[in-house]
A protein has these predicted regions:
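Short strand-connecting beta-turns/loops that link adjacent beta-strands
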Residues: 12-15, 24-25, 72
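Active-site beta-strand termini and strand-to-loop segments that position acidic
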Residues: 9-13, 22, 81-83
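Charged phosphate-binding loop/patch that engages nucleotide di/tri-phosphates or the phosphate backbone
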Residues: 115-133
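Short connector loops at helix/strand junctions that flank enzyme active sites
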Residues: 2-4, 31, 73-76
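N-terminal first-folded block
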Residues: 19-32
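Conserved N-terminal beta-strand and adjoining loop/helix that marks the start
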Residues: 1-17
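Unchanged
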Residues: 36-118
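Short, well-ordered strand-loop elements centered on a beta-strand within folded domains, enriched
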Residues: 14-21, 86-91
Length: 133
């Protein structure tokens, strides 16, 4: 079974979230993340994906699990990371742009999987709860 993970970055100073514009044919907006390799733990894979996609090391940040979605072919884990200030991500070739946006002002089009995650009441409630902590 394929395992993937993504992470919401939330800036305390601006109350905004980081989104990345994918370079694939659909050019949808997503969050940092990707496939976890067979020899990695979930957190090791998430750390690697953040280094590869936005050149940030999250190994010393508090990472909070938000959701696990499971179907017949894959498992997708969603995480949350609060940062003090917005940062400028150094993008790899998987992305061609980024934006820090306010909640409920998400860029469009969202990647379909992320759209479903954001519109899941439990995820919205968890994000709201941990934004304030």
């Amino acid at each position: 079974m394929n395992v993937s993970a993504g992470i919401f970055f939330y800036s305390e100073s601006t109350n905004r979230y980081l989104f990345l514009l994918r370079t694939d044919k659909n050019q949808s907006w997503s969050i940092p993340g990707g496939k976890i390799e067979k020899d990695e733990t979930l957190y090791e894979g998430l750390i690697r994906e953040c280094r590869e996609e936005i050149s940030i090391d999250i190994s010393n940040y508090k990472i909070i699990p938000i959701q696990q979605f499971v179907n017949n072919t894959f498992v997708y884990h969603t995480f949350f990371c609060k940062v003090k200030e917005e940062f400028i991500p150094i993008l790899n070739d998987e992305h061609c742009g980024y934006a820090w946006v306010l909640k409920n002002s998400y860029p469009k089009p969202l990647h379909p999987g992320l759209f479903n995650t954001i519109n899941f009441d439990l995820v919205r409630d968890k994000l709201k709860l941990i934004e304030g902590n």
